[in-house]
Amino acid sequence: MGLTPMMRQYLEVKESCKDCILFFRLGDFYEMFFEDAKVASKELELVLTGRDCGLEERAPMCGIPYHAANTYVGRLVSAGYKIAICEQLEDPSASKGIVKRGIIKIITPGTYTDSSFLEENKNNYIMSFYLDDNMCAMSFADISTGEFNSTHSNFKEAVVLDEISKFAPREIVLEENIKESFIHTIKERFPNISISKIKEENFDYNIDNNLKEQFNNFNENEYETIVKKSANGLLYYIFHTQKNILSNINKIDYYSIVDYLTIDVNSRRNLEITENLREKTKKGSLLWVLDKTNTAMGGRQLRRWIEQPLINKNPIENRLNAVEELLNNISLQEDLKEDLKSIYDIERIVGKVASKSVNAKELISLKCSIGKVPYIKKYLSGFKSDLFLNMEQCIDTLEDIHKLLDKALLDNPSLSVKEGNIIKEGFNEEVDSLREAKSNGKKWIASLEQKEKEETGIKSLKVSYNKVFGYFIEITKANLNLVPEGRYIRKQTLSNAERYITPELKEMEEKILGAEEKLIDIEYKLFTEIRDFIEENIDRMQKTARIISDIDCLCSLATVALENNYIKPNINAKDEILIEEGRHPVVEKVIPKGEFISNDSLIDTKENQLILITGPNMAGKSTYMRQVALITIMAQIGSFVPAKKANISICDKIFTRIGASDDLAAGKSTFMVEMWEVSNILKNATSKSLVLLDEVGRGTSTYDGLSIAWSVIEYICNNKNLRCKTLFATHYHELTKLEDNIEGVKNYSVSVSELENEIVFLRKIIRGGADQSYGIEVAKLAGLPSPVINRAKEILQHIEGDKEENSLNIAPSKEYKSKDYIEVSKDTLNTKNNLGSEIKHDTLSETNTATIIEDESTKEHLSSNKKQINCRTNDEKSIKKEVAVDSFQINFEYIKIDKIIEEIKNIDILNMTPMEGFNKLYDIINKTKDID
């Protein structure tokens, strides 16, 4: 048995969209078959059935009503699927044989425009990426708003990932032969992004003509070839999916990555710029604090401002001056905000105009929105700052469009543009005439019903209408005996009624329905003419929408500044960040009002280049560092800042290495990720950058970590091409000595108060290094069980021991045969336990013994810290090792313990077999047997 004609047609269509779920129109339903049906039934919770199709087995099938498709499409697209819509392209009743069908649209995560599934304050970007040797280009479009941005740079994965993080596209279009390793990197970092591939030729084909046709501002000589290829590839994909050239995408905006403050992927996450670390939601982010916008357009624009802070002084100061003027004119600001509240999403409405999907109600929303523009222009004339004056000169009031919409459309039109009831009375004579005929016909129907009731005496008689039988007279069976013989023609029998018609009724029906049908056709024709006129003026409306969104952003920043007592920062060119009584903008909003402790900051590229911050965990070091970065970002956005005074130097890049970012499932340890991030910072930071480093070196052994942290500080301060402004938090108290040896290092610490064996974090950053880490106290605050805390205190007391002794004699373990004698002079090392707390080792009596791990790394470490080491050979039977320490002594027993602990920490358990794990455990147990 062969395939049925319908199934053959289905399979032919499906062949052209293998990566999509095919919605195949059959009558009033969209049907899905085979694997598509299985996926859709699971995702949409539909019943999976089957259909005979000429194969040995029934084809799996599920379906949805065509009029409810948007809801189901939205759910599938949100889950990352692509949907191909296959429609009937001819009237089934007029078709001979199988109905002609074809794909009219492909809906993908990056091309979806249904406002009910899009976040109104967030763009829905689709991105294209093109790589050519060592250069790459990227383009980003939001087809719902018409934005189209392109850039290019030398190819570095980090640069591409930063741009992806900034724009957060839902979908990325790549050349089909691009390396899978690169795709894997993207998916690993951004698992929710959909990847689509197109052929190399689609980036090249008819490139200049395509771009000229699409963009009003395109000049082929202004763009690098690689940029044009990236843009052309994205346009091809949009046309391929939308089956239409979208007129709202009419301007290409090229930007250089270095035109904005660079905030890399990790820093965006660590600083919680647009979403918090835990829930990945807006609440608790900088955007959450600053967003008091009144329009969807303004909300999207403010997000862009925050994602792309400025690095040029003039535009920053223009924004700051505008915000200041709003704060000095509160009544005018309130008038502006009140009108902004009445403005709908102009950008997305005209986007629907371009895609021919706009309805009359949305055009009424457009009319109401642009009706507010003349008032906004009037308010702008009351300001004096350059930014507002320029806006007042450039804003188009769109009065001609408002006049047309107001004259043409009913205030409350039908939702569907093919049901009539759209055009206002007086706009078109033919519409008025047909409406009168329709109205008169219905009046005649009403009078007929009243006449028949009176003449037959049947009070329940009624004249009704349905699409199957048209108009009819309905009489209940209880009153059939009252029906005059021959008065009516029987049409239909129901269980408790009879339906009749008369020649006169049918004649009037033809007039009424003819008028209705013609009226619907004419109203739809007029609507499309209005829509086409608006489409011709899309660029005018987009320019006005952008000005409105900028005004909304400035009003939002002014509102936040007023509510939170922010001040206007001074933007300087001195490479200096000076903040008096600065506050963390987010933290102060989530704790009781007035409880946040403010702090001062002074960072420059000279005497205060690297601020070395010591102090216990939970004391506020990380909050303080983030606070400085966020205040800098806010200033470069053009926002007032949470401080008493702020003098901000413009930064070109902000880097952070704060908090854990392990990826154990990918086989990456904490330390490896940390080192990768530090490496990225040291390679890419400049003297104009702001760098935040927290606990560098903590993921490895104490000695290794201290050495790395020390070396990183030296590199930052001594490298003439770097010398970036740096905040460096650490538990390695030994590093505080660097203030005396390295120019630009300054010690600061978090103030702590001790009251009755309890500690209180004062959250105040003070000059000088910390002398304790309070590790046990922090553990107690964190809720560790009392027995653990008490035992820790006992161990610490034992380690500290008797500090009056000035030397330590340690006998070597029996397993060592060395005759070396090591004497370490004053100012040797402090060591740290694995919680980061400082360990001050005790002075042991001659009866105390400890195993000395004698390896080259220990010797090298001691040597690198300029300790006096004298080695001399003695008789094997009188081996003696003496370590003389000024204020404390090192118990090498703990060095061995530390090494075992580090070995345990570095076990890659995810990649071990059970037997390997058992053997590793047995090996560790054996190593501990040597320790007393």
Curated annotation (Swiss-Prot):
Keywords: ATP-binding, DNA damage, DNA repair, DNA-binding, Nucleotide-binding. ATP binds at G615, P616, N617, M618, A619, G620, K621, S622. It comes from the Bacteria. One of its GO terms (biological process) is mismatch repair. One of its GO terms (cellular component) is cytosol. PROSITE patterns: DNA_MISMATCH_REPAIR_2. InterPro entries: DNA_mismatch_repair_MutS (IPR005748), DNA_mismatch_repair_MutS-lik_N (IPR007695), DNA_mismatch_repair_MutS/MSH (IPR017261), DNA_mismatch_repair_MutS_C (IPR000432), DNA_mismatch_repair_MutS_clamp (IPR007861), DNA_mismatch_repair_MutS_core (IPR007696), DNA_mismatch_repair_MutS_N (IPR016151), DNA_mismatch_repair_MutS_sf (IPR036187). One of its GO terms (molecular function) is ATP binding. The keyword Cell division does not apply. This protein is involved in the repair of mismatches in DNA. It is possible that it carries out the mismatch recognition step. This protein has a weak ATPase activity. Belongs to the DNA mismatch repair MutS family. This is DNA mismatch repair protein MutS.
